[in-house]
Amino acid sequence: MPDARRFIELPGPVRMYRGGELPSVTIAYETWGELRGQGDNALLLFTGLSPSAHAASSMADPSPGWWEYMIGPGKPIDTERFFVIAINSLGSCFGSTGPASINPATGQPYRLDFPKLSVEDIVAAARGACRALGIDHVHTVAGASLGGMDALAYAVMYPGTYRDIISISAAAHATPFTIALRSIQREAVRADPAWAGGNYAPGEGPKDGMRVARQLGILTYRSAEEWLQRFDRERLEGSDDSANPFAMAFQVQSYMEANARKFADRFDANCYLYLSQAMDLFDMAEHGDGSLEAAVRRIDAKRALVAGVTTDWLFPLWQQRQVAELLEHAGVAVSYHELGSIQGHDAFLVDSERFAPMVAEFLAHSS
């Protein structure tokens, strides 16, 4: 299969934000466009929890990426203008070092010997990758969901190394609701006997637990209105299974099951647990001695795009307004958008009619 990934080895030991260290780190990434100068046209893109670095198609890998409508020649993130670097998160399972990677000290996967992961670790690894590529200053730091948290953390941690910020459907910290939700998802994984305390064989693991966790995630990534429009109460053909009183009866169940099985087959369970917890632990106020305002004052961006969706349960609009207001008070020129998509938190992935013009306009006015 085509593979556009490239890899950077960061020398160790790499100290982790909440303690522990890794002897070395590999970061997988993909790029589009041509780098100019010292990186003045570089756009650093962070991903959500589950995607790889394959954000868009390329000559090396023509398969569509997870943000295909957004990245490419003549698209909102125009690769004739920008050099786009998409980073596979530290802790993930698509090429970057994570719990599924081999621990050189043992010759076995790290599993739960992997140190506690934080958003700050993901960001520090991405910063190291940029510097290894000879890029000390990027034009824009961008991301959505976990990637938006990463972008905000990058802005706080490395002032003076970027010009603009794009934060979509993200937040300065997790809420009790999302912490509780992700805790239940992680519990579903750990309650599966196949998790085996994290010591399952490569390629194996708690498929049933991951499937349940993903179904719960899918439910919250979209909105009740969209579920109604897409599926209503449509039943499955031949769903009257007298031998199984709890057999699937509705189209929506079939959709969630198929999506969840696909995810469980491709994503490592321990990596999922670590990345999920990292989202819960993130709090920008830690970079301001407990004060969000003090933390955001470290950000020296010229401009920021902050956007959210009216139907997003996970990162509600009040959190987008909070980020926008904090940035404005810090002297950043903010372009703020509340988008009326019915597609919930995942709208940025699929609602090109709303998101593409917004991003295109913001970047068009960014010199």
Curated annotation (Swiss-Prot):
Stated name of the protein: Serine O-succinyltransferase
Swiss-Prot/TrEMBL catalytic activity: succinyl-CoA + L-serine = O-succinyl-L-serine + CoA; L-homoserine + succinyl-CoA = O-succinyl-L-homoserine + CoA
Molecular function in Gene Ontology: homoserine O-acetyltransferase activity; homoserine O-succinyltransferase activity; L-serine O-succinyltransferase activity
Subcellular location: Cytoplasm
Enzyme class at the top of the EC tree: transferase
Assembly and oligomerization: Homodimer.
Site (Important for acyl-CoA specificity): R182
Entry's family note: Belongs to the AB hydrolase superfamily. MetX family.
Protein species of origin: Litchfieldella anticariensis (strain DSM 16096 / CECT 5854 / CIP 108499 / LMG 22089 / FP35) (Halomonas anticariensis)
Purpose of the protein: Transfers a succinyl group from succinyl-CoA to L-serine, forming succinyl-L-serine. In vitro, also has homoserine succinyl transferase activity.
Region feature (Important for substrate specificity): 48-51
SUPFAM superfamilies xrefs: alpha/beta-Hydrolases (SSF53474)
NCBIfam families: homoserO_Ac_trn, PRK00175.1
Annotated GO CC locations: cytoplasm
Transmembrane annotation, as ranges: none
Active site: S145 (nucleophile), D312, H345
EC number(s) from the headed UniProt entry: 2.3.1.-, 2.3.1.46
Residues that bind substrate: R214, D346
InterPro entries, A to Z: AB_hydrolase_1, AB_hydrolase_fold, HAT_MetX-like
Main localization (coarse): cytoplasm
Annotated AB hydrolase-1 domain residues: 41-349
Pathway in which the depicted protein is active: Amino-acid biosynthesis; L-cysteine biosynthesis; L-cysteine from L-serine: step 1/2
Entry keywords, A to Z: Acyltransferase, Amino-acid biosynthesis, Cysteine biosynthesis, Cytoplasm, Transferase
Pfam families linked: Abhydrolase_1 (PF00561)
Biological process (GO), any one: homoserine metabolic process
